[in-house]
């Protein structure tokens, strides 16, 4: 006896896009490249990837695989911003959010057939620092961001910053949170923090990344957008 195909799940509508769209599998390479360009001067990137100048291609492979994972993740939402590069439209910004475990949108934004993972040599990485950072981040999220939408990745290519792409992506995510009455949390970089605060996020705590050998650690603040109060 043939097995009946289950009916498609009825998801709630999401806010409409104007200049943005949901990410697709064809965007992975552009998302990876712009993420390296946008993140490489951040305190996190420098801490984790001391060998980047020697092996720049390794970070690109890492981000390509990360975005493939996110596109297939039932709890992830990935959107992109586009702009002109000559006569061609290119991806210039990426926003990625992780939904709470009980979200009715789980599975809504899954992208199939994202392609094979690339060999990730990670020669630029300091594995010890990566372990430290991941452990501290996990503990911080469990303490401050449990049950919230978490802003996982948020970046605009340096050549296209100050054109409103970052603000547009973040505003869309806030409309989604407001519609679902779910708060959003983030542990932003020092450079990115003002963008969040300008749109209504409030600082509620700190995350301390420890020194590792001769490498100095750093502190980032934790911020939350309280959608339930809007």
Curated annotation (Swiss-Prot):
Please name the pathway: Mycotoxin biosynthesis
Span of domain N-acetyltransferase: 143-230
Put simply, this protein is called Acetyltransferase
> What lineage is this protein's organism placed in?
Eukaryota, Fungi, Dikarya, Ascomycota, Pezizomycotina
Q: List the disulfide bonds.
A: none
Query: Could you tell me what this protein does?
Result: Acetyltransferase; part of the satratoxin SC3 cluster involved in the biosynthesis of satratoxins, trichothecene mycotoxins that are associated with human food poisonings. Satratoxins are suggested to be made by products of multiple gene clusters (SC1, SC2 and SC3) that encode 21 proteins in all, including polyketide synthases, acetyltransferases, and other enzymes expected to modify the trichothecene skeleton. SC1 encodes 10 proteins, SAT1 to SAT10.
MF GO annotations: acyltransferase activity
Q: What else is known?
A: Trichothecenes are sesquiterpenoid toxins that act by inhibiting protein biosynthesis.
Give UniProt keywords alphabetically.
Answer: Acyltransferase, Transferase
Locate the transmembrane regions by residue number: none
Which InterPro entries does the protein's record reference? Acyl_CoA_acyltransferase, Trichothecene_AcTrans
EC numbers listed for it are: 2.3.1.-
CDD domains from the UniProt entry:
NAT_SF
- Entry superkingdom: Eukaryota
């Amino acid at each position: 006896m043939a097995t009946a195909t289950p009916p498609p799940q009825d998801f709630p509508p999401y806010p409409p896009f104007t200049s943005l769209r949901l990410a697709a599998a064809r965007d992975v390479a552009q998302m990876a490249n712009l993420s390296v360009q946008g993140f490489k001067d951040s305190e996190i990137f420098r801490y984790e990837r001391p060998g980047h100048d020697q092996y720049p291609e390794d970070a690109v492979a890492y981000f390509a695989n990360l975005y493939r994972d996110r596109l297939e993740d039932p709890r992830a939402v990935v959107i992109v911003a586009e702009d002109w590069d000559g006569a061609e439209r290119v991806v210039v910004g990426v926003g990625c959010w992780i939904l709470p475990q009980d979200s009715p949108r789980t599975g809504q934004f899954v992208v199939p057939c994202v392609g094979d993972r690339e060999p990730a040599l990670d020669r630029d990485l300091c594995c010890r620092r990566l372990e430290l950072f991941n452990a501290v981040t996990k503990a911080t999220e469990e303490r401050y961001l449990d049950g919230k939408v978490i802003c996982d990745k948020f970046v605009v290519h340096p050549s296209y910053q100050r054109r409103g792409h970052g603000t547009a992506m973040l505003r869309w995510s806030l409309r989604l949170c407001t519609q679902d009455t779910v708060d959003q949390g983030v542990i932003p970089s020092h450079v990115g923090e003002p963008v969040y605060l300008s749109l209504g996020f409030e600082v509620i705590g700190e995350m301390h990344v420890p020194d590792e050998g001769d490498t100095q650690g750093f502190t980032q603040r934790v911020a939350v957008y309280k959608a339930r109060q809007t």
